[in-house]
């Protein structure tokens, strides 16, 4: 028996040749990590020896070799027929008596109470789930198998799945000899996730490869809906360093629609063992996991990653009967762990065209090609290499087809769907979950698939002009004396940008989060009942329906956005500027018009620090402070600093500091908290010593400082030609600000485009002794080059 089946408690990674990657990993976790609290369902596995004995007893080795020799290895025109014949040979065969008896004995020992308890029966090939052989899903698994008769049938079906079309093609593509691959079958106690939830996890951020995140996603019911991409799952981002410190480590939660719930078919005679049902409305607006459960899974993920010594791809499930969480599979992550994250290619579309469809962007590339609408993988011969697959949804059966595609577009699916996983592995762009791509895209027309514009992917009509920039940051040295920092606004770009050479974030714009993630005016949330427009109220209700108070929605979303950026650059400084909309910009937020005055010149009106203590906005400023307090104190991201914009007078600075104290941001109670002020008004420069008595540092805002020094309205096209940061008056103010700040013992930096565009301006700043310069990401490399040259010249001139 021992040679034909092995209990999980007796299996380790070293047994991979006998039980395959999947079962070796399950056994390793069960035997080695259970003592650390990682819960893995018990089970056993048939061995490779059992598989060979099955083939030999039925004299199948030679017939299978002969079948594979008949395969058309150029065009694969007879792949379907060959695969079907091979599977029939195995399904028509019988299990040797000693193997069948061993399986039945192992099954009964798992429970001991009944012969009808449910198990999962999973295939595990001896070359599956290895980093160099990464396509999972080549072989079949069978869930909710009850009784010895059904179990033995499922084992034969697993054996037959070694010859699915996709498995045969995969072995051909990877140079594996068909007659050298054995199949082990894992038999594992079922987790009743059909009564609860299930999902997947990565011990890195799956889009960028950022290593300090545990990314979890989950759906109601069985996890197949995530793999198939038929529903939009909940997503959770957990930050490893603060998790280890027992802080509130969930930095971001995204509520998915979870439209369907997959459960076991109530009809025992149904052709399908599972059925998809519509999720109840109340379940769709509820997260599948509580915060404690999210952190428990994340801690297990850390234990698993530490044990294996590499990033891991994990499957989890919650038992609806016991309420317990389980890890049901773990394999090495195979995409980002194989890449150098410091080699980055960025794309920019110079002129956008007509948008045909949008969805979730997978990757950051752009591809142009002929659209080929394919209802199923059986029409693979229609696709020519370099064309773009447009379909409803993909599954592992699509793998041979997708390898020829320049890009993938699907109407269904999410970031963890099959199409997304394959796109990452193949390194091609994909736009998933479009909803209307098949309707709007014509078969045979040329399209451009763009994933370079953030989380949203676009499909444009025609061939667009694309600019490609290749960076290798592996050996790029930062300046020696002047910090090179980034300007960041979009949390969705933060993890990718963390691989750029940087000394932190010199300006985090809060406005992007409010506009794109929150969308509503904070006062409209606080005084929702005052709103008279029914359409606006309905839109706000749709955004906030799963929060008990609408103000909590603002605080939570803002805190998550800030925390994501702070985590991406942790422990480097992330200087968060409090909201700096102008009144016309605030008015454009949902409900904003009811709370904003109409101003002739908003650029010089009710903006910046003046709002924070004013009765029109002070309640909203409290929400901003609560978000900062949550990020620093509860989440433990103490690298977050605060910056006050457009502070006109020293007295106004005192009022803002007092307002922050009243709202819980008190430097006496939190000595690590630093508060900076923008130096963008001449009064900030002329009275820099007095401002330095209130604030911990300055950041020169060259745009507003130029506007106010030269009396130029930045929004006026007529006088825009006079706008010049290098005007002597502006440079004198900048030089004065740097000298006065340093004299007062305060740090000072500058945010803006000019140091990257004009080497002589960078030279001026370095000569003045500025502490840091912050750049937009696309200007960072040029900016670093200019700073380094300026530092070299400054040293030579001394």
What are these regions (language model features)?
Residues 68, 79-82, 103, 175-176, ...:
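Long, charged amphipathic helices and adjacent flexible linkers at domain junctions
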Residues 137, 309-334:
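Conserved metal-phosphate-binding beta-hairpin within the catalytic cores
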Residues 1-186, 195, 284-292, 300, ...:
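N-terminal beta-alpha lobe that positions the nucleotide/phosphoryl donor
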Residues 115-118, 125-135, 140, 180-184, ...:
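Conserved alpha/beta-domain cores
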Residues 136-169, 193-269, 328-360, 404-411, ...:
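Extended active-site and interfacial segments that coordinate phosphate-rich ligands
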Residues 213-313, 318, 357-365, 391, ...:
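Conserved catalytic alpha/beta cores of large enzymes that bind or transform nucleotide phosphates
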Residues 321, 335-337, 357-360, 365-388, ...:
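Acidic, glycine-rich flexible loop/linker segments
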């Amino acid at each position: 028996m021992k040679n034909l089946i092995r209990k999980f408690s007796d299996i380790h990674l070293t047994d991979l040749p006998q039980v395959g990657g999947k079962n070796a990993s399950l056994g390793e976790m069960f035997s080695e990590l259970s003592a650390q609290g990682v819960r893995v369902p018990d089970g056993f596995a048939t061995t490779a020896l059992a598989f060979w004995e099955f083939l030999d007893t039925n004299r199948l080795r030679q017939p299978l070799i002969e079948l594979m020799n008949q395969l058309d290895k150029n065009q694969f025109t007879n792949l379907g027929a060959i695969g079907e014949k091979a599977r029939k040979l195995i399904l028509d065969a019988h299990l040797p008596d000693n193997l069948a008896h061993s399986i039945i004995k192992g099954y009964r020992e798992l429970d001991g109470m009944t012969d009808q308890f449910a198990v999962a029966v999973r295939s595990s090939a001896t070359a599956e789930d290895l980093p160099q052989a990464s396509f999972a899903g080549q072989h079949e698994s069978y869930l909710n198998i009850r009784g010895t008769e059904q179990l033995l049938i499922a084992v034969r079906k697993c054996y037959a799945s070694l010859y699915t079309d996709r498995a045969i093609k995969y072995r051909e593509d990877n140079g594996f000899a068909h007659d050298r691959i054995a199949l082990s079958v894992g038999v594992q106690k079922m987790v009743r996730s059909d009564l609860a939830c299930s999902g997947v996890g990565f011990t890195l951020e799956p889009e960028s490869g950022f290593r300090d995140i545990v990314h979890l996603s989950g759906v109601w019911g069985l996890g197949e809906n995530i793999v198939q991409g038929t529903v939009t799952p909940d997503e959770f981002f957990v930050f490893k360093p603060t998790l280890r410190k027992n802080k509130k480590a969930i930095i971001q939660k995204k509520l998915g629609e979870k439209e369907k719930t997959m459960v076991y078919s109530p009809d025992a005679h149904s052709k399908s063992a599972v059925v998809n049902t519509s999720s109840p409305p109340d379940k769709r607006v509820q997260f599948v996991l509580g915060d404690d459960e999210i952190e428990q899974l994340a801690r297990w993920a850390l234990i698993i990653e530490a044990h294996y010594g590499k990033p891991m791809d994990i499957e989890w499930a919650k038992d609806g009967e016991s309420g317990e969480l389980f890890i049901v599979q773990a394999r090495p992550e195979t995409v980002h762990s194989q890449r150098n994250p410091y080699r980055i290619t960025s794309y920019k579309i110079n002129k956008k065209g007509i948008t045909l469809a949008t969805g979730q962007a997978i990757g950051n590339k752009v591809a142009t090609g002929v659209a080929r609408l394919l209802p199923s993988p059986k029409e693979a011969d229609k696709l020519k290499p370099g064309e773009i697959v447009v379909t409803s949804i993909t599954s592992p059966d699509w793998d041979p087809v997708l390898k020829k595609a320049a890009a993938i577009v699907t109407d269904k699916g999410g970031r963890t769907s099959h199409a997304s996983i394959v796109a990452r592995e193949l390194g091609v762009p994909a736009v998933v979950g479009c909803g209307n791509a098949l309707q709007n895209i014509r078969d045979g027309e040329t399209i451009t698939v763009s994933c370079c514009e953030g989380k949203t992917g676009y499909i444009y009509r025609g061939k667009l002009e694309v600019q490609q920039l290749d960076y290798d940051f592996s050996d790029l040295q930062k300046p020696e004396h002047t910090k090179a920092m980034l300007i960041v606004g979009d949390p969705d770009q933060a993890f990718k940008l963390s691989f750029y050479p940087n000394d932190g974030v010199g300006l985090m714009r809060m406005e992007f989060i409010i506009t794109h993630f929150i969308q509503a005016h904070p006062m409209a949330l606080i005084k929702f009942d005052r709103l008279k427009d029914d359409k606006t109220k309905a839109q706000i209700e749709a955004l906030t329906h799963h929060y008990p108070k609408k103000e909590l929605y603002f605080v939570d979303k803002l805190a998550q956005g800030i925390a994501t950026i702070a985590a991406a650059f942790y422990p480097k400084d992330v200087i968060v500027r409090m909201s700096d909309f102008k009144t016309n910009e605030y008015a454009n937020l949902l409900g904003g018009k009811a709370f904003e005055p109409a101003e002739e010149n908003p650029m010089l009106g009710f903006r910046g620090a003046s709002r924070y203590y004013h009765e029109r906005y002070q309640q909203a400023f409290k929400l901003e402070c609560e978000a900062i307090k949550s990020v620093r104190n509860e989440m433990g991201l103490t690298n977050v600093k605060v910056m006050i914009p457009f502070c006109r007078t020293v007295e106004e600075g005192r009022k803002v500091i007092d307002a922050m104290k009243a709202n819980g941001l008190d430097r006496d109670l939190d000595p690590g908290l630093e508060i900076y002020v923008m130096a963008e008004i001449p009064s900030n420069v002329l009275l820099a010593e007095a401002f330095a008595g209130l604030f911990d540092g300055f950041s020169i805002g060259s745009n507003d400082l130029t506007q106010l020094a030269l009396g130029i309205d930045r929004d006026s096209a007529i006088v825009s030609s006079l706008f010049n940061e290098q005007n002597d008056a502006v440079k004198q103010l900048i030089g004065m600000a740097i000298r006065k700040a340093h004299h007062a013992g305060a740090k000072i930096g500058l945010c803006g485009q000019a140091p990257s565009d004009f080497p002589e301006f960078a030279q001026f700043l370095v000569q003045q002794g500025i502490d840091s310069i912050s750049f937009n990401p696309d200007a960072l490399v040029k900016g670093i080059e200019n700073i380094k040259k300026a530092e070299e010249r400054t040293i030579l001139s001394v």
